[in-house]
């Protein structure tokens, strides 16, 4: 009789033997993603013979690529997960999920959220969790203008739009633009649900098979653990992809978006994702699905 250990080793050997083509791996150039993925793409953790071809894009581009099935493994918004979960399985590591880290709705002048109806609102993408939260907050809002997330504050400031939903490092810098925070959508979500806010997670194509997905999961979890234990190791890689961001903002970004939920979603993280997508289904924003999140 072959022991479980021998069977496991043989199975992993097969993964390495058949994985001759690198898997496409999508993530954003934001510091939290480059911080977490650095060990994986630079061979600092055991990938059991799987290699990766990295593709760095803003999160909405990644959402759209996943919608077309063009990436094997990728970061996506949890809003996008609601549209692709039949084809992609969620991984338990690598998520941006937590408290006090949600998108902000900002304006040039202080106005009441009720006065937004009929006004133009810049959003960072149709499949972003930022837009999903805004639609759950007020389903009557309709006049959205999609633009790259790093152009939204300027658009609000010069009056091209009446308001904007900002994400990523913009939450640390909007006050320097003289903008007003009308609403913290993360705080609103936490009050409404009592749960942390699920922003984005890592998914893998279900067609890769359970064994390969499990191997990717282990390598990603080990990579997150490596970076959290050795935070300075990825510094050059982070700054290579965030050249216009100063050290203080970079550190704040990583500190806010990389946490214990990034290591493992845990029960609370899974409940938060389920709650968000349940509400999105009930609102008719995403299709109803009975497929489990995980493989």
Indicate residue ranges for each PLM-predicted region.
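Secondary-structure end/capping motifs
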Residues: 209-279
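Bilobed "Venus flytrap"/periplasmic-binding protein-like clamshell domains
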Residues: 21-42, 103-162, 169, 271-274
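Pocket-lining segment of extracytoplasmic ligand-binding domains
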Residues: 149-240
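A local structural motif
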Residues: 45-55, 137-147, 286-291
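Hydrophobic/proline-rich hinge and linker segments of small-molecule sensing/allosteric domains
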Residues: 90-113, 190-207
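Beta->alpha turn/N-cap motifs
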Residues: 58-60, 69-82, 148-149, 166-172
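N-terminal amphipathic/basic-hydrophobic helices that include classical n-h-c signal peptides
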Residues: 1-18
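A structural signal for short loop-to-beta-strand junctions that line the ligand-binding cleft
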Residues: 19, 23-24, 87-95, 120
């Amino acid at each position: 009789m072959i022991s479980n250990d021998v069977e496991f080793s043989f199975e992993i050997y097969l993964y390495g033997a058949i994985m001759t083509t690198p898997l496409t791996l999508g993530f954003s150039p934001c510091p939290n993603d480059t911080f977490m993925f650095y060990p994986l793409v630079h061979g600092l953790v055991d990938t059991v013979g799987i290699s990766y071809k990295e593709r760095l894009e803003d999160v909405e581009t990644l959402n759209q690529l996943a919608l077309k099935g063009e990436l094997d493994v990728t970061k996506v918004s949890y809003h996008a997960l609601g549209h692709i979960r039949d084809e992609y399985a969620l991984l338990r590591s690598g998520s941006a999920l937590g408290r006090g880290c949600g998108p902000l709705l900002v304006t040039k002048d202080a106005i009441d959220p009720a006065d937004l109806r009929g006004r133009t609102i810049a959003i960072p993408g149709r499949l972003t969790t930022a837009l999903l939260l805004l639609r759950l907050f007020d389903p009557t809002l309709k006049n959205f203008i999609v633009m790259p997330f790093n152009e939204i504050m300027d658009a609000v400031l010069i009056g091209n739009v009446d308001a904007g939903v900002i994400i990523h490092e913009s939450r640390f810098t909007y006050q320097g633009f003289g903008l007003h925070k009308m609403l913290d959508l993360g705080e609103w979500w936490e009050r409404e649900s009592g749960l942390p806010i699920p922003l984005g997670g890592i998914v893998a194509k279900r067609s890769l098979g359970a064994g390969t997905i499990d191997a990717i999961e282990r390598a990603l979890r080990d990579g997150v653990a490596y970076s959290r234990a050795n935070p300075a190791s990825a510094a050059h890689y982070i700054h290579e992809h965030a050249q216009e961001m100063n050290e203080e903002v970079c550190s704040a970004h990583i500190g806010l978006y990389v946490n214990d939920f990034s290591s493992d979603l845990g029960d609370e993280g899974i409940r938060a994702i389920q709650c968000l997508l349940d509400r999105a289904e009930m609102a008719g924003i995403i299709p109803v699905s009975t497929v489990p999140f995980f493989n």
